[in-house]
Amino acid sequence: MEEIVLNTIKKYNLINNGDKIVVAVSGGPDSMCLLNVLKNIREKFNLELFVAHINHMIREEADSETEYVKQYCEKNNIKCFVKMANVLEMAKQQKRGTEEMGRIVRYDFFNYVANKVFADKIAIAHTENDNAETVLMNLMRGASLEGLKGIEPIRGKFIRPLIECSRDEIEAYCEENKLDPKFDKTNNDNIYTRNKIRNLLIPYIKKEFNPNIVESLNRLAVLARQDAKYFSEIVKNEYKNLVIFENVNKEKHNIIDKNTNIGTSQEENENQKNGDITELNDINKTNIKETVEQQIILDLKKFNKLEYVIKSRVLLYTINKLLGTTKGIEKINVEDMIKLCEKNIGNKYLIPNKNVKIFIKKGKVFFIKL
């Protein structure tokens, strides 16, 4: 097991000598395996380890799991940070699903601890099986190449040293090392989509179609990541060729023509429907001076010469650069944006996710952050 993890660390350059690492630990087999492996190799890499544990206050066993994690850390001289979070109440207040709320709370806490101890990395115990489940779930949703990448071994500060380890290998390691991890019984409840995929769909595929489906899905994820990386480089280069003006900071630049109304009233925002192309009211008649904080402008003529597959990626890249996310942007929104550009529709605009306004003016494509 430790050899597999060391190979993964080397392959993806997950850890550097002297790193401070926050390990996300629930007390289950995956996270306890991860913590124990990192504990065993910490001298090899001169690591400083910290544990971040959240008690979601949902299950009766939660308190005993918290105590178990604290005792392990005390025994092995690892500083442990614990957060008590009433996830059910928080989800109710914020009108979110319990799963979503739990994830938000966890990652907020991991980042908080990382900032507090000046950590270089945050280690998450995602496994080969988790990755297979994610790829299959995204595939069924009709995901693009990005969705087929699955769970990446490294993304920013977050590293996943167990991503090439199977769940069977992890449970065997826990037994061999007498870790006595705590099992979350809710993982057996086939209520959530992921649990259904894990407990019902993948075992069925293994039995009836492909006994190596987990390995196959992980191989697909690797290939998708390779292809996505190739496209990413192409898109970055095309963006550099297309961009006329870029201000993604909060410094103000008054560069819009004075007779271009780029303002959007609150009433207009409330009436927008995702994907709709809406008339830009009096775009050539309004004589106002407007200062725009954050925006990107692309060359329309050059954009329209691109292949469709690159156009869609350039649009998403541009929006992500402006907003820091493409959440809420669906396939139909991308199609509408391309249509707006190809037909050079100069008296209409799009607000695809209520956070960005897109329109054409004098041979340019404007992306305005709202």
Provide a role label for each language-model segment.
Residues M1-V25, P29-I202:
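Core alpha/beta nucleotide-donor-binding catalytic domains of modification enzymes
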Residues M32, E133-T134, N195, N199, ...:
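Non-catalytic, well-ordered alpha-helical scaffold segments
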Residues N177-E215, V222, N355-V356, G363, ...:
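Mid-to-C-terminal catalytic subdomains of enzymes
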Residues D63, K92, I191, P211-V214, ...:
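Non-catalytic, surface-exposed connector residues within folded enzymatic/regulatory domains
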Residues R141, L145, K207-V214, K229, ...:
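Alpha-helix boundary/capping and short turn/kink residues
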Residues E2-D30, R42, E48-F50, V105, ...:
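AMP-forming adenylation/ATP pyrophosphatase catalytic core
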Residues E65, R106, S166, I197, ...:
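Hydrophobic/aromatic residues within well-ordered alpha-helical segments
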